[in-house]
Design a protein with these regions (language model features):
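Surface-exposed amphipathic alpha-helices with a cationic face
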Residues: 33-41, 92-99, 142
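Glycine-rich phosphate-binding active-site loops on the catalytic face of alpha/beta enzymes
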Residues: 7-21, 68-84, 109-111, 115, ...
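Catalytic cores of alpha/beta
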Residues: 1-3, 54-65, 92-96, 100-106, ...
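Short catalytic-loop micro-motif centered on adjacent basic/acidic residues
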Residues: 46-49, 75, 104-106, 128
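Conserved anion-binding
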Residues: 1-72
């Protein structure tokens, strides 16, 4: 973390230890996140929970642990793990669990404007989008603005 900050990083992403979480090693997961948060010296840390590998109770637990350890964001995934795309329901579950204690970033499977707007309404403030998705979303925004006259 310190090396990345010295190179100019303004935010850090870290993937939680999913195996430890699934094994019930919650203190270990928390200490791991806290070590990165502490090393970041105030630089925001996003904890990536890889929701596609987790059951709902594990998503809630991972989100709680991230907040307790001082993470600035709970991020749904890296985009590298196959599984389920981020859904509005996942964002709602995370937001119901952590409230405003940390920000939420949706990543993986967010493909259209209606999904972005629904996730925003559920408390998500950041979105990890691919180029094709961005283009489609921006085209849809332009169409809706034009339709308003």
């Amino acid at each position: 973390a310190k090396d990345m900050i010295s190179l100019g990083c303004k935010e850090l992403d870290m993937v939680i230890n999913v195996a430890a979480l699934k094994s019930g090693m919650y203190d270990y997961v928390e200490q791991d996140i806290k070590a990165v948060v502490d090393a970041a010296c105030g630089v925001p840390v996003k904890t990536i929970i890889e929701h596609g590998l987790l059951a709902n109770d594990e998503i809630k637990r991972a989100s709680e642990i991230g907040v307790k350890a001082g993470a600035s964001f709970i991020k749904t995934g890296t985009g590298w793990v196959s599984g389920k795309p981020t859904t509005v329901e996942t964002i709602r579950l995370i937001h119901e669990t952590i409230g405003d204690a940390a920000k939420i970033k949706a990543a993986g499977g967010v493909r259209d404007l209606d999904t972005v707007l629904a996730m925003y309404d559920e408390g998500c403030t950041r979105f990890g989008l691919g180029v094709r998705s961005c283009r489609g979303i921006l085209d849809e925004v332009a169409k809706r603005v034009a339709a308003r006259g």
